[in-house]
Structure formats: C-alpha cells, structure tokens
Amino acid sequence: MTSPTTNFALVNNTGSSDAYAYVTGLDLGDNNAPVFIQSDGKTVYKPTSPSAPQSPLAADVAIPLGAAGSTTSVTIPHLAGGRIWFVVGGKLTFVLNPGPAIVEPSVTNQDDPNWGLHWGFAEFTYNDVQLFVNISYVDFVALPIALNLRNASGAEKKVEGIPAGGLDQVAQKLEAQHAADGAGWDKLVVRDGAGTLLRALSPNSGRVADAGLFEGYYGAYVDSVWAKYAGEDLTINTQWDWGNLQGRVVDGDVLSFGDQGTFAKPSAGDIFSCSTGPFGGYPKDKADVLGNLGARLAAAFNRSTLLRNASQPDGEQVASYYQEAVTNHYARILHEVNVDGRGYAFPYDDVVASGDDQPDQAGTVFDGAPDLLTVTLGSLQAASDGGDKKEKEGDDATPGKEKDTTGLWKGFLGFVNKATGGCFGRS
C-alpha cells in the first residue's frame, strides 16, 4: 500500500524563468473525478460541472517553475490518467465542458489557443500499488523532459529524454526520411508562421490533422505478411493465461486465431493508432484475448518485424526493430534521438519479449514505495546524433524490467492500461 500522497520535484533546466507546470488527473478516491493541482503545488482543485461548454477554471492552476535552475515541489494524491504539463514562454489554457470534463491543449487544432506555444507532458498513475511514470511521445514530441524516480530505499530509476537540440534532430530526420521515400514524414514537422519549430507529430496525430496522410503506406507490407502466414503459423505469446496462440491467414482474407477470433488486414491508420479497424471494436466476450493479441500484432507492425520473426513478441531483439523500408519511422527516429533510446513512441511500445532483461523501450519508471520523482524540463545532456545508448561507466542505470512468472513486466501493458484506466498509450 502506497502513501496517500507522493512528492514530485520539478526542475527548470530550460534557461528561462517564464516556464510553468500543470498537473491534471482523475481522483481515484472520488469516482475518477477530474482534478488539477493548484498553483501552490499542493492544493487540489476539483472543478464542478459548468453550465456551458468552454467555461473558464475557477482556480489558478499554473505552477510557476521559477528562475532557471530552480526546483519546485509538488504534492500528488492518488490519481489515474495523470499528466504533468510543461510550457515555456507563456501559459496554457485549460477550459471545462459540462460533466465536468477538462478540455486539454491540442496539437492538431490550429484554432486551439495553445497551438503556437512550446509545451509537452509526461504521464503518470499513482495508486495503492505504485507510482508509474513515462515520457509520452505517442501524440508528439516537443520539450526535453527527463525522469528520475527514487524509492524509499534510495534506489533510482531514470529516463533521460531527448538531448538539447533533440527536437531539431527529430525534424531533420523526418524531413530526410520524406526525401528518401516521399511518404509524407515531413508533414509531421510543425512550425509556426515565423518558421519556428514547435513540435513533431506522431503519424497518428498527423492523420488527425490530415486524414489522407500515409494512406496506403503499409499496403504492400501487410500483403507480404498475409502471404507469409497463409503458409505458416504466426505464434503469439500472450504472456498471460492464454499462453501461446497460433494464427494462420485463411481464405486469403483474415488472420485467424481459431476460436479466439480473427483480424482483417489493417490500414496504415489502424497500425499507427493501434485502436481502429481490426485493433478495436472487439466482441465483448473476446475483448480481453483479442486486445492482447492486437497489442502484439500492432507493435510488430509498427516495428515491421512480422516478416522476420514468426514468434511474437518472443525472439524479438531491439536491433531488429524498424529495419524494413516501410515502418514507423517516427518511432525509429524518436528512439534514435533519445539519449538512452527509450520513450513511448506509439501506443504499444511497451510490448517486450518474455525474459527480456534489457531496459524497456517505452521509457517507464515505476515503484511501489516511491520517495521522490524528479522531472526535469530541459535537457540533461548536450546534443548528439542519437549518441551511444549505453550508460556511461559510473552512471546509475535503470535496471531491467521486473518480471513475474509469465514474463509480463510489472507495469501496465498497453491493453491492460485501457481496461484499468491507466494513462499510458493515450492519444
């Protein structure tokens, strides 16, 4: 059982005194009511339902981060679906709709008052069991954010985030990928009217802004996968009570897992979202098992490993991810640019092979006895071209993933998040 509250230390490493944080979440002790932490960093603001949409907040929820180099303390109660929002060079605008429901900043709506600001967030859930945190790139990448979680015994886990100039690297690499294949990766790079780089969108967010983006992109690859598994089994280790399940393409049409259900061919939009087409709308009586299978299929499509490995996710090696010409190059580039190679780049980036003792790709930190989470806004390291992802000698590296006997690492695997109200892999 965790303490009723935990402590966050927010470090302003931006070089600017015009930086703010916001904390939102769902109150686990009050039927998931939406809450903010107020500007003092400790008082909970629980908005009431307004009479009209787009109503202003009744409290100041902008937490000033102070002068460059300063640290601000924040007290966090048990929350699900939490986000720590950061902005530099202004303040974010949050409003309320009846419910109440928080209207959050948008990166896909140019009419949103926050669209032209430099902002980003990390995600967390703090419940009776643990504090679980990640840097999310599922929607976009913008500001450098780093995590360091210290537990009650003094042990630390960390995620280093993108380096100084990391967003510029991401933009350059996306534009270079478009120059190589003409697929539209450059359209993920977002600049304001003056040409200032604001952020890079994920392919899924890019398709929200432009529904035709990447149309047909995965078509030939999916056809090749279907042809391969018309002649051999695809084995998926569910890493759960269902064990290994075998799939085979039948009638040239669907990938069938027998009595468990089938998957039609996914489109690029389905693959990038991980939640539409064959990866969503499961029959109620099979939702759990198909959600599990769908998570592993979606991860393998994003990483483009299905033609290389007929046993998913077992046998997967990080070095084999994103090696095909058709792949999620946004995810590839994010992992290349991050200092330690870790960060949630698509909704099921937490899928890993059983027995994998390497640090997770998703860039999570979690502990059942958290003492202090330090979240640094602004890079901890200077720019490099992706750099050496190995920890330097003497550094306190994040240990490998804790496992239970089924090989499921002790976080919230993507489909479990959705079922339990977790915050990870949202878009």
For each of these PLM feature ranges, what is it?
Residues 2-427:
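Extracellular low-complexity, O-glycosylation-prone Ser/Thr/Pro/Gly-rich "stalks"
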